[in-house]
From Swiss-Prot:
InterPro entries reported for this sequence: IsoCit/isopropylmalate_DH_CS, IsoPropMal-DH-like_dom, Isopropylmalate_DH
Any single Gene Ontology cellular-component annotation: cytosol
Similarity-based family: Belongs to the isocitrate and isopropylmalate dehydrogenases family.
Record's subunit section: Homodimer.
Name by which UniProt lists this protein: 3-isopropylmalate dehydrogenase
Organism: Phanerodontia chrysosporium (White-rot fungus)
Enzyme class, spelled out: oxidoreductase
Length: 380
């Protein structure tokens, strides 16, 4: 029987993106080679700043079409000072357009410690950081980033700029229901809904609809509400109070997910996934029953270290593990990838072990990738 093909579009992006994605790609190739019934087909495309340089736009029609027909997408990182915020064409426009086109409405981002040995790298005191285990679910395609806006004009009478933050009942219901995408222990993780209901009308709608949806559809879940300014203080003063699932809208989630992600000490360690509600286009190769998703590390393009081969690829490799974990035929390889990362990390706990510069070591990006692949090959 011939192997079923699973198409993954690779978007290395800018800065350190190509370096860390290369190591995750090696991991996916090992998984594909070890499978008797599924073959991974990798297809690389320009995205972000590198696409601007080559094609004059951050997301070409060809790249978008490839993403629409893919089973999953693995993204590195985009952006850099080369393409400044005042440029009319910016790398970040590619990400917003991709989210909208694919219906990627929810981003899931964890913030936790794989080992207590990493507590020393947290900006928080060990007594405050120990035991933090937060998952941020951020709404991705609504709110201020996608509302109507007006830029500052050149004429005197156009001396103002504005953005609008709009949310509908169905949008809030959809993101609240995405809570089911997070595997839960027994008892289930509590949900902390974050808003600014004391000031914003959209937040008052958010709080009302989130409460009704949880009460009517997930009565077993514990739900509480925090104002965004209070939540931002808790994340640095007593983050364990927010252990569980943080559920919030686009702008607040952008800020709070970045704030919580620095608690583990290195942005290079953590993966993330962006989810679509359902397949929006037929795949001519085979029918799919699961929605399209984008997987990426939480870090940025880090142009200051790009090309030096010292970026930490663990977050990208774990993003590949998340990708595999969504497919029943690859749940075992997903766990094997996570175990291989843990094996490489344990070596890093030793004085002369494997650690990249962000964790106080001198290992190269390829050193980490090689060790993970070595352990993975011995396991699969």
């Amino acid at each position: 029987m011939s192997k079923r093909t699973f198409k993954i579009v690779i978007l290395p992006g800018d800065g350190i993106g190509p370096e860390v994605v290369a190591e995750a790609t090696r991991v996916l190739e090992v998984v594909s080679a070890s499978s008797s019934d599924v073959e991974i087909k990798l297809e690389t495309h320009d995205f972000g700043g590198c696409s601007i340089d080559k094609h004059g736009e951050p997301l070409t029609a060809a790249t978008l079409e490839a993403c629409k027909l893919a089973d999953a997408i693995l993204l590195g990182a985009i952006g850099g000072p080369k393409w400044g915020v005042n440029s009319k064409v910016r790398p970040e426009q590619a990400l917003l357009a991709l989210r909208k086109a694919l219906g990627l409405y929810a981003n899931i981002r964890p913030a936790n410690f794989a080992s207590d040995s990493l507590l020393a790298y947290s900006p928080l005191k060990p007594s405050v950081a120990r035991g933090v285990d937060i998952i941020v679910i951020r709404e991705l395609i609504g709110g201020a980033y996608f509302g109507e806006r007006k830029e500052l004009g050149a004429r005197a009478q156009e001396d103002a700029a504005w953005d609008t933050m709009i949310y509908s009942v169905p949008e809030v219901q959809r993101i609240t229901r995405s809570r089911r995408q997070v595997a839960s222990p027994d008892p289930p993780l509590p949900v902390h809904s974050i808003d600014k209901a004391n000031v914003l009308a959209s937040s008052r709608l958010w709080r009302k609809v989130a409460t009704e949806t949880i009460q009517n559809e997930f009565p077993q879940l514990k739900l509480d509400h925090h104002l965004v300014d209070s939540a931002s203080m808790l994340i640095v003063a007593n983050p364990k109070k927010l252990n569980g699932v943080i559920l919030t809208e686009n702008l607040f989630g952008d800020i709070l997910s970045d704030e919580s992600s620095v608690i583990p000490g290195s942005l290079g360690l953590l993966p993330s996934a962006s989810l679509a509600a359902r397949p929006l286009w037929p795949n001519t190769a085979h029918r799919r029953s699961s929605p399209r998703r984008v997987y990426e590390p939480i870090h940025g393009s880090a142009p200051d270290i790009a090309g030096q081969g010292i970026a930490n690829p663990i977050g990208t490799i774990l993003s590949a593990a998340m990708l595999c974990g969504t497919r029943s035929v690859w749940r075992s390889p997903a766990k094997a990838i996570e175990a291989a990362v843990e094996g490489a990390r344990r070596q890093g706990d030793r004085r002369e072990g494997l650690r990249t510069a962000d964790l106080g070591g001198s290992s190269k990006t390829k050193d980490i990738g090689h060790k993970v692949v070595e352990i993975l090959k011995a396991t699969l």
